[in-house]
């Protein structure tokens, strides 16, 4: 009953959930705006970056979901954007990531990113990721077009099949130069690839949030196996390549002494490729 208290609750809920609902109790939200922590950020290429994002919920359609964002950098004066449509063969209660997944997704993205942004567990535009231990000036304008199918089973096996076309244009302190006497500047790299990945985590359970789903218990072992093949001459792809990766995670408890989380990962790039297609460490220069 306190004046203005509902606005305090609204703001707190937006920051805790990281999304703003557009509905009411009587008319549940069909579109959520967010993540809130990506609306303002900063990086070497964009400078000040403003972004508006939104995603639909099962209140609009329990099978068909849309997600996207538009961002603008005030330093490079370029627009960045992403659009995604996902069809879930399972009826969802609120969001498509709810376990178990059985869906097909088409996405289109044009954005600026560093080579290691793909390893981040959070959104790369998270405002807290803007604070880094050193300047990250080696970045790329990346255009990705992807079609992905994901299937999860009750016994913990996840299968992912994906085809993707990527265009990588270096910018900032990053440049692609041929490794020969000519030292020719390469304006961009195009790849066309298909991948197959398996993830097996018996006994794993999740809690769903509006931004991601979080494992309830980290005691379940996780086994991963993936292979990606690149096709030269297909839809502009410039390189043949084969990348195989395997991984293992397991938590070990030592009574009252604590625990040890073990991560083991290995991979092989079987072809001669430019350095952006080589295996790289999962570096994160943010605090």
Language-model features: where?
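Outer-membrane beta-barrel initiation region
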Residues: 1-73, 79-81, 87-96, 118-119, ...
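Residue-level detector of the transmembrane beta-barrel scaffold of outer-membrane proteins
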Residues: 51, 65-67, 103-107, 158-162, ...
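C-terminal outer-membrane beta-barrel translocator/porin domains of Gram-negative envelope proteins
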Residues: 40, 100-108, 113-121, 128-137, ...
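Strand-connecting loop/turn motifs
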Residues: 61-63, 99-101, 154-156, 220, ...
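Outer-membrane beta-barrel pore domains and translocons
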Residues: 57, 69-73, 86-88, 107-111, ...
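Transmembrane beta-barrel architecture of outer membranes
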Residues: 47-51, 78-84, 99-103, 142-146, ...
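Outer-membrane beta-barrel domain signature
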Residues: 71, 75-78, 83-84, 102, ...
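Outer-membrane beta-barrel signature, preferentially recognizing the C-terminal barrel domain
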Residues: 125-159
